[in-house]
Amino acid sequence: MIIEYEVMRMKRIKSFFKILGMFVLCASFTGCGVNGNVDDYAVNTGYGDSDTVKSSSGVSKDSIKVGVIHLSDPADGSGYTYTHDIGIMGMQQNLGLSDSQIIRKINVNDSDKDATRKAIKECIDEGCNIIFSTSWGYMETTAQMAEEYPDVYFSHGTGYMSNGKNFNNYFGRIYQPRYLSGIVAGMNTKTNKIGYVAAMGSENSEVTGGIDAFALGVYSVNPSAQIYVKVTNSWYDPAAEKAAASTLLNMNCDVIAQHCDTTYPQLLAQQKNVYSIGYNSDMSKDAPDACLCSVIWNWSAYYTAAVQSVIDGTWDGSNYYGGMNENIVGITQLADFCKSGTQQKVDEAKKDIISGKLGIFDGVIETNTGTTVGESGKTLKDSDITGNINWYFKTVTLVQ
């Protein structure tokens, strides 16, 4: 078992260096401070005072310990947890920390508050100075633990709670590369039916915002295409993800995108000789003949800056919401079998996103229920994007 783990660890190391080639890693931390373009991103949690405060003293690099709570096992080699762990390894590499300074808790069910609390407490007992809880469902328990242990720093990924002191939230503008991947899908569909396997329904703004950004990207190049969404109601459920992808394929969808944690949608797309859009990590290795591109994370940009701030004593409790400008999110190189002209359309939109000309959720947007959101000449606020997108764009159909 030890040998098997080390083999998987070496594979992750190789993948880490591959990802280094995709991103500029902000090794000097220039341009990727911990707050990363927060704008009006919501801070208040209901737990304690929300006024941001700087940490009073740092922690020596030799003595710092970093805890990580993972939803699944990064040894799986693809998907959400794998990508976060690549980010942790990047942080470790950038800061020169030893393996003994990284404490991992894996396969922690984020719907089990007792299991979450136990994992966090174990990290505290093992001397961790900062703990990253990487899944949405860890949010409330992490907030509670932060109040109980004010001398430990807590950082929660993908949610919205924080206290402005020892507990912050981090995420990224993943809707930006989602939009670009929508362009890719819209350019390459032949049936004008595009499937999307979603972990959560419209109640979850993270997932729904990604779907809408993707649909807007599709619409920008192919207004005739329709997006069909099948929800699994779980962040990580291999069987449900496989079943959802199968349902969409049976509807004649010829591009399958996803916001879920396994590679099953990619694998099924390859088996059925249709296209796919990967998520979290580069999934072309899993479905080389299907994957048009992948929407990916470079979590090491944030993890490095956050841990460095604890070492330096400059942690201020602010939230992080970086985007393509901060290199925390991106899109992989397009497959060489993409339709001619796809790269040009992606490059044009990417340039506009980075310059700020294109905000994705711009102007008046029509929903699939006939209502509208947004205002002419304005872009949705960060707080709306992260917490209030509970609607679907007009070309989206929810599959029951």
Q: Model segments located where?
A:
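Bacterial N-terminal signal peptides that target proteins for export
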Residues: 10-20
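Short, aromatic- and cysteine-enriched interfacial helices/patches
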Residues: 17, 34-36
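Generic extreme N-terminus detector
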Residues: 5, 13-14, 26
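C-terminal motif of bacterial Sec signal peptides marking the signal peptidase cleavage site
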Residues: 27-31
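A residue-level marker of the well-folded mature domains of exported/periplasmic proteins
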Residues: 36-400
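Short, Lys/Arg-enriched N-terminal segments with co-localized hydrophobic residues
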Residues: 1-9
